[in-house]
């Protein structure tokens, strides 16, 4: 159990975050951690305090949201988390239906701000790939 990577999860609502953490728990291959506060500083602090190996951030493009959790905002979180935990891999789970966002996502990966992204309902296959990449990186460090 201790050898499994710690996967921190933060989506736009606590309920979505809990569901994602429970889903990862059922999927296996990691020790999931729900970050229930979507506040920038809270995400950064908790990722560092919990020694997260992987951070999965939900991205919302909804116009009605009080504070849209867009790609730029999430990349800002990723950069700050990486300053404190350079070994933490950061992935974005984006809502579907916004093909115009693809260039920004590609650029974020190209610039090394994030390690990857998924659009739509995150699949078990994709989550396992990310966990495997994280585990491989952890082994190379130790």
Question: Model-found features: residue ranges?
Answer:
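A short, charged/proline- and glycine-enriched loop
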Residues: 2-7
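Structural motif
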Residues: 9-15, 37-38, 58-61, 93-96, ...
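Two-component/phosphorelay signaling modules centered on CheY-like receiver
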Residues: 9-40
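Short, aromatic/basic amphipathic alpha-helical patches
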Residues: 19-26, 77, 102-111
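Output/docking surface of receiver
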Residues: 33-38, 94-142
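Conserved phosphotransfer microenvironments
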Residues: 39-43, 53-85, 94-104
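Two-component signal transduction core modules
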Residues: 55, 90, 116-117
């Amino acid at each position: 159990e201790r050898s499994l990577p710690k996967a921190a999860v933060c989506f736009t609502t606590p309920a979505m975050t809990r569901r994602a953490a429970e889903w990862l728990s059922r999927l296996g291959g990691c020790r999931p951690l729900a970050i229930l506060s979507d506040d920038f500083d809270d995400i950064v602090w908790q990722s560092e305090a919990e020694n997260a190996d992987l951070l999965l951030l939900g991205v919302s493009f909804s116009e009605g949201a009080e504070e849209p959790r867009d790609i730029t905002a999430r990349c800002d979180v990723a950069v700050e988390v990486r300053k404190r935990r350079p070994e933490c891999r950061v992935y974005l789970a984006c809502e579907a239906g916004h093909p115009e966002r693809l260039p920004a996502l590609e650029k974020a990966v190209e610039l090394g701000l994030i390690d990857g992204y998924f659009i739509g309902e995150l699949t078990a296959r994709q989550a396992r790939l990310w966990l495997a990449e994280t585990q491989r990186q952890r082994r190379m460090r130790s």
